[in-house]
Swiss-Prot record:
Catalyzed chemical reaction(s): a beta-D-galactosyl-(1->3)-N-acetyl-alpha-D-galactosaminyl derivative + CMP-N-acetyl-beta-neuraminate = a beta-D-galactosyl-(1->3)-[N-acetyl-alpha-neuraminyl-(2->6)]-N-acetyl-alpha-D-galactosaminyl derivative + CMP + H(+); a 3-O-[N-acetyl-alpha-D-galactosaminyl]-L-threonyl-[protein] + CMP-N-acetyl-beta-neuraminate = a 3-O-[N-acetyl-alpha-neuraminosyl-(2->6)-N-acetyl-alpha-D-galactosaminyl]-L-threonyl-[protein] + CMP + H(+); a 3-O-[N-acetyl-alpha-neuraminyl-(2->3)-beta-D-galactosyl-(1->3)-N-acetyl-alpha-D-galactosaminyl]-L-threonyl-[protein] + CMP-N-acetyl-beta-neuraminate = a 3-O-{alpha-Neu5Ac-(2->3)-beta-D-Gal-(1->3)-[alpha-Neu5Ac-(2->6)]-alpha-D-GalNAc}-L-threonyl-[protein] + CMP + H(+)
Domain of life (superkingdom): Eukaryota
UniProt name for this protein: Alpha-N-acetylgalactosaminide alpha-2,6-sialyltransferase 2
Organism placement in taxonomy: Eukaryota, Metazoa, Chordata, Craniata, Vertebrata
Any single biological process term in GO: viral protein processing
Keyword Transmembrane carried by entry: yes
TM region(s), chain numbering: 8-28
Protein source organism: Homo sapiens (Human)
Gene: ST6GALNAC2
UniProt keyword terms in alphabetical order: Disulfide bond, Glycoprotein, Glycosyltransferase, Golgi apparatus, Membrane, Signal-anchor, Transferase, Transmembrane, Transmembrane helix
GO MF annotation list: alpha-N-acetylgalactosaminide alpha-2,6-sialyltransferase activity; sialyltransferase activity
Tissues expressing this chain: Expressed in skeletal muscle, heart, kidney, placenta, lung and leukocytes.
EC number, as in UniProt: 2.4.3.3
UniProt: CMP-N-acetyl-beta-neuraminate binding residues: N156, N179, S304, H336
């Protein structure tokens, strides 16, 4: 039997979208809770702990001029103050690599650890991230530092098409983008500023293939732009090492790739950040512990790239705004803002977008996050 054709096909598509939207709306309207911190976890809810933790992941623990500090909103919230641990290291760099860390993380599969991965590859990669700039997301600025770090995290959701949010996005101190971040032709809706580009090698290369004809013909590049590697596999460590050394990838799925084609010709270690596997574990356990983990899709599941970037910003910035992320009326918009024809969002088993949507909704209601909706 062939594929449905003509009016019957469109009727079937509309019915499918309507049913999907109804089911999601019912789920989304339910009260969504998140797993609390494990027994024996450190208490990081004190006012002093929040300021100390900010200093550990950025170049200063400021924020005095902010009209609204997200960490104070966390402190006031009866549920989220028990989930956030702002003292956990966000980034992994050379000084943190010890035999004890190897022994512990080698018990867990990527992206939560190094089980089955080469010690030589991990060690040689981290040895290149040996400067203090590798430990902090925000390097000390050359000029007068802002008194409040305001961050925009830009997802690729269709809600941004026609939004005219570009100027608002660019007004932030730092702008995070990810995966197929098409800018040309959509400047009015998504802005032009990019401070950080987050990805796994897999999502980056898949985006270049899948969205090439839609305008994503190269990874964002720029003198002050930095890249955040999500270590989902050994290939992320191999690509990162090759990028810093300025040599072709010597092995694996990306053998022969020239990193400068992705990241530009002058890509020193200071251009790259690496998320800590412990940080990804913490985010998954406390915020995005999906029921998919206990199914036969468990080995596939991990938080989406957008979720990891948004939660990274929430652990390092003073104010965070999210654009292009899933909302309760997602079915009104195309999957991505740069698509020429309406394409419904598909829920794949490797991410739990329903759980992520509920989290963004609740963080927005708590005043911890400003979620763009329309």
């Amino acid at each position: 039997m062939g594929l449905p054709r003509g009016s019957f096909f469109w009727l079937l598509l509309l019915l499918t979208a309507a049913c999907s939207g109804l089911l999601f709306a019912l789920y989304f309207s339910a009260v969504q809770r998140y797993p609390g911190p494990a027994a024996g976890a450190r208490d990081t809810t004190s006012f002093e702990a929040f300021f100390q933790s900010k200093a550990s992941n950025s170049w200063t623990g400021k924020g005095q001029a902010c009209r609204h500090l997200l960490h104070l909103a966390i402190q006031r919230h009866p549920h989220f103050r028990g989930l956030f641990n702002l003292s956990i290291p966000v980034l992994l760099w050379g000084d943190l690599f010890t035999p004890a860390l190897w022994d512990r993380l080698s018990q867990h599969k990527a992206p939560y650890g190094w089980r089955g991965l080469s010690h030589q590859v991990i060690a040689s990669t981290l040895s290149l991230l040996n400067g203090s700039e590798s430990a902090k997301l925000f390097a000390p600025p050359r000029d007068t530092p802002p008194k409040c770090i305001r961050c925009a995290v830009v997802g690729n959701g269709g809600i941004l098409n026609g939004s005219r949010q570009g100027p608002n996005i660019d007004a932030h101190d730092y702008v995070f983008r990810l995966n197929g971040a098409v800018i040309k032709g959509f400047e009015r809706d998504v802005g032009t500023k990019t401070s950080f580009y987050g990805f796994t090698v897999n999502t980056m290369k898949n985006s270049l293939v899948s969205y090439w004809n839609l305008g994503f013909t190269s990874v964002p590049q720029g003198q002050d732009l930095q890249y955040i590697f999500i270590p989902s596999d050994i290939r992320d460590y191999v690509m990162l090492r090759s990028a810093i050394l300025g040599v072709p990838v010597p092995e694996g799925l990306d053998k022969g790739d020239r990193p400068h084609a992705y990241f530009g010709p002058e890509a020193s270690a200071s251009k790259f950040k690496l998320l800590h596997p412990d940080f990804i574990s913490y985010l998954t356990e406390r915020f995005l512990k999906s029921k998919l983990i206990n199914t036969h899709f468990g080995d596939l599941y991990m938080p989406s790239t957008g979720a990891l970037m948004l939660l990274t910003a929430l652990h390092t910035c003073d104010q965070v705004s999210a654009y292009g992320f899933i909302t309760s009326n997602y079915w009104k918009f195309s999957d991505h803002y740069f698509e020429r024809k309406m394409k419904p969002l598909i829920f794949y088993a490797n991410h739990d977008l329903s759980l992520e949507a509920a989290l963004w909704r609740d963080l927005h209601k708590a005043g911890i996050l400003q979620l763009y909706q329309r």
